[in-house]
Amino acid sequence: KIAIMPSPNNPTGNCFRPKDVEEILSRFNGIVVVDEAYAEYSDNPFVSRVEEFDNLVVLRTFSKAYAMAALRVGYAVSNKKLADMMICVKIPYSLNMISEGAAIAAVKDQDFVKRSVQMVREQRPILDSGLRKLGFETFPSDSNFILARSPIDHKVLVDGLKQRGVLIRDFGAKRRTENCIRTTVGTAEHNALLLEKAEEVISGCR
């Protein structure tokens, strides 16, 4: 049996509490996979604790903080016993040479990752505050995006922003994220543009 826990979660952006993950690890009779695709933006990664639990596997990716989504590079971290088991079932040649070379080069450029993550951490509360001032209900985020419930119809907002050259993700028709949108935390200039155009769309509905 395998239980998969995305932390930070997508699309909510929040992390599981460490004590909740620990409880699941201790009580679940199977392998617990914690997907930490967005972990660089959070404060509670579990990747350093794989030796504490005999049933923990942590997944990481180069698609987010390393900005290499097109190359489809990721990896798993676990204790040796689980790693040996995964190697037995891993498909051969799962990574091409171009992606492998790019990943090695990316690992050596930690300055880029640090700058990227720092920018998100600085801009995230600023964008969150700006959205709330426009009437959005924002959800706490440990990631590089913010989920927010729109003060107007989600389709009107998404379409209005698209007409103004701004693209956001629409989650408004999904269960439990009714009337919600998700926006990436960008640079100060990008975030200011989003807020400006969102205010235009919202004002046009009132």
Set out the residue ranges of the language-model regions.
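PLP-dependent aminotransferase class I/II
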Residues: N55-R132, F136-F139
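PLP-dependent enzyme catalytic core of the Aspartate aminotransferase-like
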Residues: K19, Q163-R164, A173-R206
